[in-house]
Amino acid sequence: SVGFKAGVKDYRLTYYTPDYETLATDILAAFRVTPQPGVPPEEAGAAVAAESSTGTWTTVWTDGLTSLDRYKGRCYHIEPVAGEENQYIAYVAYPLDLFEEGSVTNMFTSIVGNVFGFKALRALRLEDLRIPPAYSKTFQGPPHGIQVERDKLNKYGRPLLGCTIKPKLGLSAKNYGRAVYECLRGGLDFTKDDENVNSQPFMRWRDRFLFCTEAIYKAQAETGEIKGHYLNATAGTSEEMIKRAVCARELGVPIVMHDYLTGGFTANTSLAHYCRDNGLLLHIHRAMHAVIDRQRNHGIHFRVLAKALRMSGGDHIHSGTVVGKLEGERDVTLGFVDLLRDDFIEKDRSRGIYFTQDWVSMPGVLPVASGGIHVWHMPALTEIFGDDSVLQFG
């Protein structure tokens, strides 16, 4: 036998620390880990902690120039998933210093940047994150939040009503504005650009903005209520996106919209800052979420994407409908709806909430029930979501 061992080391030795007491400032993550056959769960959990913090596959001399104990992620608890073979929940604690302040982008690059392609894992899913106040306080959060939005709109004690203009692609700007007027005049609070309406050849963004603004002012004058249309500012560059938001502000409309996953968190945070500085509400659509959150055992659960959006900033976010879905889905959906709206959310595994989350004073986000709902769903929707929600039809 050879007298030395090749330098690939066991992660367990350094990164699996079952005795670790988590700090109030740590960012905590719950991963659903499916190890490859033959890989012990402790090694898989430790590998996740290592690869998403200070680890690399071997020992390098520069390790001696820093304090691993201060900067390493630690897998501090592992439990098997009930009813699933070879699946475990690995809990990982990250020291706060690993993250740039006020950057959701950096948080995700660190926590989910590399580990998902890891050989020792068959699959990996980020189920939940605990964001400590020490970190969340470095974010502005939603431009306005639920209470300020109600004050701006002068609408209280009920869900807000909206609808998406259809056909979503192909209408001219003038006919589009006409549909907006009819909906708002008929009693809706909001109408919405579809998520893929940006600035296509058949309807350029500025034409749409102008005709929709005309519709809003006409409907407001006739009803005596404040009306809005989610003008989609999503664009190919963040400069162009801000340009569209500036135009919306100059037109005096109340709200713009962004596709935050396709547009990206950096662009979204910039837009949220602009919206707060200029009194615009920000409606967030989650196009592309199912690419990331649909698989049970791999990807990122939507509750994490929802928490990230509350930090990055948005006043509304699409969050599923529950109606007509499975019962279990209902509790989980209501779990992340609470994470969006409330200040303090208790750990509750039955609702998929792995950690107690304290948002301190960060404004809340209105959940938007959207997608395949119609008027007969109203009683169920109001019962499920309560007053602080947007019911988005069409």
UniProtKB/Swiss-Prot annotation:
Names of required cofactors: Mg(2+)
Catalyzed reactions: 2 (2R)-3-phosphoglycerate + 2 H(+) = D-ribulose 1,5-bisphosphate + CO2 + H2O; D-ribulose 1,5-bisphosphate + O2 = 2-phosphoglycolate + (2R)-3-phosphoglycerate + 2 H(+)
Chain sites annotated for binding Mg(2+): 192, 194-195
N6-carboxylysine carried by residues: 192
Gene Ontology BP terms: photorespiration; reductive pentose-phosphate cycle
Marked site positions, Transition state stabilizer: 325
Entry keyword set: Calvin cycle, Carbon dioxide fixation, Chloroplast, Lyase, Magnesium, Metal-binding, Methylation, Monooxygenase, Oxidoreductase, Photorespiration, Photosynthesis, Plastid
Any GO MF annotation of the entry: ribulose-bisphosphate carboxylase activity
SUPFAM superfamilies per UniProt: RuBisCo, C-terminal domain, RuBisCO, large subunit, small (N-terminal) domain
Pfam families on file: RuBisCO_large (PF00016), RuBisCO_large_N (PF02788)
Protein name: Ribulose bisphosphate carboxylase large chain
Taxonomic lineage: Eukaryota, Viridiplantae, Streptophyta, Embryophyta, Tracheophyta
